């Protein structure tokens, strides 16, 4: 089916919502097929059952933050040592997803979904998180797209190129990543309060797709999910209960739903066993979400001026704290019988410069070889053009084995300590680092405000996680007036210096994107927001949460009911 959303006609119809549920987003007949009374009732049930738990978990995050801000550092929890030391395993891996050597990721856009499913990757992670700007239109179209993808009818007609896209006979297995616990969905009010974004994402997707998915993709299992940005196992416990609730509603076996948790916050690295334990009936492993992890390192240590990061480009997987995290993740997953997934190299193909392209591909190749040799069972690709390289690295090492869960134990990683996981990254800080953060942060935010959650910038993939690093690093450097020691000039970062950098980088952006795009895009608004966040006395928790209201579009309702 081709997706054609209706032309907006104000106030002609409203969604058929159950009691206590108010949909404030634009009405569209196509969206109404997703926002059915039954599906909304399911979302409302989830919201009512779990909102107290979610609020408590968010309060615990704030409490932990207060402790870190008073000088504490995260570490292993003595009270859950029995879980770390215990002899237990997760449920066995469903055959449909035993082989996950290359997974492609991307936002839930129609053409991207078709391209990703056809890409030759084993898995496609359809993203409502880092790669999506969660506007009402993006979210609802995303659900329509996923439903069409799961039932196999999805097509897309690119009119400018007169090209029709449809699914191949063989496609990647679909995983869906709902938003993190922290993000509200302001277009759906439940009992007068914005719904929890991830419960909307999960609830709508699950409700409409579980039956078909299990039949066609999961060989009796599924649906499959990726779970982002958790900080503690109590958050995994909520997800486990959500899954059990959904399985009960659907009348399917407990343990049908499976999820891979991204370890992408610093506190969560100390909770990997505990997270797997909570989800042991529903787990298919952990993934190294390296970009959010770096962001989280800065956020966790926002009040620790002795733990400043060097230039963003220097914080890679070669840093001791990053390597330790990846090694410990592999050991933990394999001990518990599940996949240890690698992460995303940020390089993407460079079409107009063969030499630069070869260098970019070589960086990806090296990153993937490092991952597979370390024992990872699979990895992420940001772009279809990277899949052959990722495949080659993983297949070259693993051969026909679907994964390395049983063959690579990494017992040596048992010796990794809290100090290893927290070791301060090494490297210099430069004015160019400050400039690049500023240029990337502003352009990313401008894209996000106008509906794109992942964009190519300076030949790299940028999304919410990578842009967060730019924001918090600028904040940290300004807050502590750090010396730019890589320039040899002894310059310290100040609000004044940052102000000049912003002005100059805005001029550069205008030159690079052209006057028209600069005028019609939201660069000036993005600049204001980004500057405010970088110079705020208190660090905002999330870039996207702080500016979310700018993409909320409430439509008046109740004029007539169809
Ligand atoms: C830190 C993290 O969370 S990582 C996970 C979240 N981030 C992501 O998922 C980012 C995914 N990647 C992307 O969004 C894109 O690759 C971008 C934005 C970086 C670059 O996209 P583009 O500028 O469209 O790339 P480009 O023009 O080279 O695309 C060429 C073709 O590949 C397709 N393509 C590019 N990336 C993807 C993808 N990830 N999935 C499916 N198709 C893709 C394009 O749709 C285009 O298709 P077409 O030839 O049929 O028109
Ligand atoms: O979600 C992935 C990350 O690196 O962040
Ligand atoms: Mg992430």
UniProtKB/Swiss-Prot annotation:
It is an enzyme of class 2 (transferase). The keyword Transferase applies. InterPro entries: Malate_synth_C_sf (IPR044856), Malate_synth_sf (IPR011076), Malate_synthA (IPR006252), Malate_synthase_CS (IPR019830), Malate_synthase_TIM (IPR001465), MS_C (IPR048355), MS_N (IPR048356), MS_N_TIM-barrel_dom (IPR046363). GO terms for molecular function: malate synthase activity. Pathway: Carbohydrate metabolism; glyoxylate cycle; (S)-malate from isocitrate: step 2/2. Disruption phenotype: No visible phenotype under normal growth conditions, but the frequency of mutant seedlings to establish into plantlets with true leaves is decreased under short day conditions. It catalyses: glyoxylate + acetyl-CoA + H2O = (S)-malate + CoA + H(+). It comes from the Eukaryota. The active site is at 177 (proton acceptor), 463 (proton donor). Belongs to the malate synthase family. Does not seem to be essential for lipid utilization and gluconeogenesis in seedlings. This is Malate synthase. It comes from Arabidopsis thaliana. The lineage of its organism: Eukaryota, Viridiplantae, Streptophyta, Embryophyta, Tracheophyta.
């Amino acid at each position: 089916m081709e997706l054609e959303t209706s032309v907006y006609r104000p106030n002609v119809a409203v969604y058929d919502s159950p009691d206590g549920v108010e949909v404030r987003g634009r009405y569209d007949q196509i969206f109404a097929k997703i926002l059915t009374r039954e599906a909304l009732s399911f979302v409302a049930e989830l919201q009512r059952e779990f909102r107290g738990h979610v609020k408590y978990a968010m309060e615990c995050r704030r409490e932990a933050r207060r402790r870190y801000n008073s000088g504490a550092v995260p570490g292993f929890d003595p009270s859950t040592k029995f879980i770390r030391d215990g002899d237990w395993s997760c449920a066995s891996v469903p055959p449909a997803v035993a082989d996950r050597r290359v997974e492609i990721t991307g936002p839930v856009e129609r053409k991207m979904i078709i391209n990703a499913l056809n890409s030759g990757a084993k898995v496609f992670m359809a993203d409502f998180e880092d790669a999506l700007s969660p506007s009402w239109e993006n979210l609802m179209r995303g659900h329509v797209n996923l439903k069409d993808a799961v039932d196999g009818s999805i097509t897309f007609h690119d009119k400018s190129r007169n090209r029709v896209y449809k699914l191949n006979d063989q496609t990647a297995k679909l995983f869906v990543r709902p938003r993190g616990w922290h993000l509200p969905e302001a277009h759906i009010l439940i009992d007068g309060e914005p719904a929890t974004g991830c419960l909307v994402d999960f609830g709508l997707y699950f409700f409409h797709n579980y039956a078909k998915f299990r039949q066609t993709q999961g060989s009796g299992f599924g649906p499959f999910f990726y779970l982002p940005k958790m900080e503690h196992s109590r958050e995994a416990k909520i997800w486990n209960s959500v899954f059990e609730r959904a399985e009960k509603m659907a009348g399917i076996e407990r343990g049908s739903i499976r999820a891979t948790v991204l370890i992408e916050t610093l506190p969560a690295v100390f909770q990997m066993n505990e997270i797997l334990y909570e989800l042991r009936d529903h787990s298919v492993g952990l993934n190294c979400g390296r970009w959010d992890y770096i962001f989280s390192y800065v956020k966790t240590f926002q009040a620790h001026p002795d733990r400043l990061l060097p230039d963003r480009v220097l914080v890679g997987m070669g840093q001791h704290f990053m390597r330790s995290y990846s090694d410990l993740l592999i050991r933990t997953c394999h001990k518990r019988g599940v996949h240890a997934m690698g992460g995303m190299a940020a390089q993407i193909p460079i079409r107009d410069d063969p030499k630069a392209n070869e260098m970019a591909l070589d960086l990806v190749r090296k990153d993937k070889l490092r991952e597979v040799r370390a024992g990872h069972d699979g990895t992420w690709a940001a772009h279809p053009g990277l899949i052959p390289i990722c495949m080659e690295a993983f297949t070259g090492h693993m051969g026909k084995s679907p994964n390395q869960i049983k063959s690579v134990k990494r017992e040596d990683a048992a010796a990794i300590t809290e100090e290893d996981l927290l070791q301060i990254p090494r490297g210099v800080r430069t004015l160019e680092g400050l400039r690049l953060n500023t240029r990337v942060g502003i352009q990313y935010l401008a894209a996000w405000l106008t509906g794109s959650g992942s964009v190519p910038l300076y030949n790299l993939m940028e999304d919410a996680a990578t842009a967060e690093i730019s924001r918090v690093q600028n904040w940290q450097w300004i807050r502590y007036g750090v010396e730019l020691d890589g320039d040899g000039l002894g310059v310290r970062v100040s609000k004044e210096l940052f102000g000049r950098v912003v002005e100059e980088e805005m001029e550069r952006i205008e030159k690079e994107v052209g006057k028209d795009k600069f005028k019609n895009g939201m660069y000036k608004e993005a600049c204001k927001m980004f500057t405010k966040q970088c110079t705020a006395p208190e660090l905002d928790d999330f870039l996207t949460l702080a500016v979310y209201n700018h993409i909320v579009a409430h439509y008046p309702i109740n004029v007539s009911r169809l």
